Amino acid sequence: MILARRAVLAATLTLAATLVLGAAVPSRAADDNSVDAIKKRGTIKIGVKYDAPPFGSLNPQTNQVTGFDVDIARAIAKKVLGSPDKVELVQVKSDNRVPLVQNGDIDAFVATATITPARMKTIDFSNVYYRAGQSLLVKKSSSVKSYKDLDGKGVCSVQGSTPEQTIRKLVPKANVVTFETYPECLTALRGGRVDAVTTDNVILGGYEAQDPANLELVGGLFTFEPYGIGIRKGNASLVKAVNDTLADLKKSGEYAKIHERWLKKSVPGDFGQWFNMPAEKAAEQFANQKPG
């Protein structure tokens, strides 16, 4: 009996010590992703998409990821570390980009992410760096011309995206199918499993450009999507560095060059109204819009 009591006491003390040490030493320090920590490390880890042309796509011939978001990521590396080459590009998807930045596995993501009130509860965002709008991609032979034509029809989007949430609200009778990546949605569209793919117009436009004989962008824009760069909650130094990068890109004219390089057109006339808009204001505008 005495030995049993001693064993219980020892186990209790060990557990208590473990809990105290665990509380005192978190698994990953909150400042591991600060600007100072990044400078000491010598590289910045930025998440980008590999399946969202022209914002981020992997070239199978060169095995290099390129795109609008990639150029923004390199500009951030240049601002923070003095060289655009001091960036480690990490593949992210719509459903894992937030957890990756929350856990400190990446320092930030530039990945076609809409600034929303819900997301701002879990991570911080930079100011707005691009504004898109939700649309539809269909086969050219399709009878679908608007989201209003989707009742009883199949529509695909990616998991964890705002377009998925929006289309469910707008067309509750649609058969919404989700995958992790856009290419999976395109396969479903071409194979007849779904009648449309929905996400931001610039992403859909990239896929339309790859197959203009068979695919068509329809429905116009029925939302606006203010894109921000996702950063770990409370990482004020990196938020400032990223916002300073955006301001520099506008002032130098480099942003306009990036826009023309990847989107094949000049910045829009309302560019000054939304570019570098504070994240809080962008989230409020997103929440107050009436899709349709």
Predicted regions and their residues:
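Extracytoplasmic small-molecule ligand-binding "clamshell" domains
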Residues: 29-108
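Ligand-binding clefts/hinges and TM-proximal coupling segments of bilobed small-molecule sensing domains
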Residues: 31, 166-177, 217, 247-292
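Short helix-initiation/N-cap motifs at beta->coil->alpha
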Residues: 31-33, 87-99, 142, 159-162, ...
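Short loop->beta-strand "edge-of-pocket" segments that line small-molecule binding or catalytic clefts
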Residues: 43-48, 66, 148-161
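A ligand-binding cleft/hinge motif common to bilobed small-molecule-binding domains
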Residues: 96, 112-121, 166-169, 183, ...
